[in-house]
């Protein structure tokens, strides 16, 4: 017994000396790193001009300690089929996403949710363009993308993704994940989802900040989604 105690003391000292104040978990480090990466990706567009339409990006301010954890298409599919959690599908350049994120994080903080899984759609989905009157795939989808579409099929609607050029419509013959999309999964089943943000007023564009009324409306949407998943949560714990 004395020998075991000595071994335990040695291991503790090793962790203290070579690992900082203790042996911290890899998962916590990864999530913290993900949160910082997410903050940097979104905030670096503040005050810049979007090339596609010449509009000024809406400004966001994100805390370093946020609940984001990056996942790819295959990991998202596994969560949808087998686990419980919230997945956010978005991209840093998406103006609707930039308006949605502060609201989503506020709800997560109130609900004491530590993790929101994040699928960066730029790193997952394909891109089509019309070139010389033909539909061309200019960016290939990443591994697991079509399996993800299948897993989300029930909430993606019936219509396939189409592009229009010179009055002609081109059908990709596949569904599309539109952003921002927040999906709530409970024990391997999708129980709730919300796509987009809220309706804009006549004097607003997609780059305009949300009004208080719009913020409150979106907040209630996300709050309901979280409650449908974590319905055993109280003010103190989940």
What kind of region is each of these model predictions?
Residues 65-84:
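A short beta-strand-turn-helix
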Residues 171-238:
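Non-catalytic, surface beta->alpha helical segment in thiol-disulfide oxidoreductase systems
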Residues 2-27:
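Sec-dependent N-terminal signal peptides of Gram-positive bacterial secreted proteins and lipoproteins
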Residues 80-94, 104:
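Short active-site neighborhood of thiol/selenol oxidoreductases, capturing the structured segment around
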Residues 98-111:
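Typically the conserved alpha-helix immediately C-terminal to a functionally engaged Cys/Sec
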Residues 94-98, 182:
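The canonical Cys-X-X-Cys-His
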Residues 70, 89, 113-163:
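Thiol-based oxidoreductase modules, predominantly thioredoxin-like and allied folds used
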Residues 28-65:
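N-proximal helix/coil linker or "cap" segments that precede and/or mark the start of modular domains
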């Amino acid at each position: 017994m004395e020998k075991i105690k000595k071994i335990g003391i040695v291991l503790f000292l090793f962790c203290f000396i070579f690992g900082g104040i203790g042996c911290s978990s890899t998962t916590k480090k990864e999530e913290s790193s993900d949160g910082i990466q997410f903050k940097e990706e979104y905030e670096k567009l503040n005050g810049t001009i979007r090339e596609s339409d010449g509009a000024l990006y809406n400004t966001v301010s994100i805390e370093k300690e946020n609940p984001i954890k990056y996942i790819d298409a295959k990991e998202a599919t596994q969560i949808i089929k087998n686990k419980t959690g919230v997945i956010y599908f978005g991209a840093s350049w998406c103006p609707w996403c930039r308006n949605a994120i502060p609201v989503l994080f506020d709800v997560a903080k109130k609900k004491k949710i530590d993790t929101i899984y994040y699928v960066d759609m730029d790193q997952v989905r394909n891109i089509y363009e019309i070139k010389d009157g033909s539909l061309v795939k200019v960016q290939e989808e990443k591994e697991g993308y079509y399996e993800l579409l299948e897993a989300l099929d029930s909430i993606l609607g019936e219509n396939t993704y189409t592009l229009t050029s010179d009055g002609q419509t081109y059908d990709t013959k596949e569904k599309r994940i539109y952003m921002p999309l927040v999906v709530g999964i409970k024990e391997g089943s999708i129980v709730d989802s919300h796509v987009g943000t809220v309706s804009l007023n006549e004097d607003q564009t997609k780059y305009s900040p949300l009004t208080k009324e719009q913020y409150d409306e979106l907040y209630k949407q996300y709050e309901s989604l979280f409650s449908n998943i974590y319905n055993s949560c109280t003010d103190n714990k989940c």
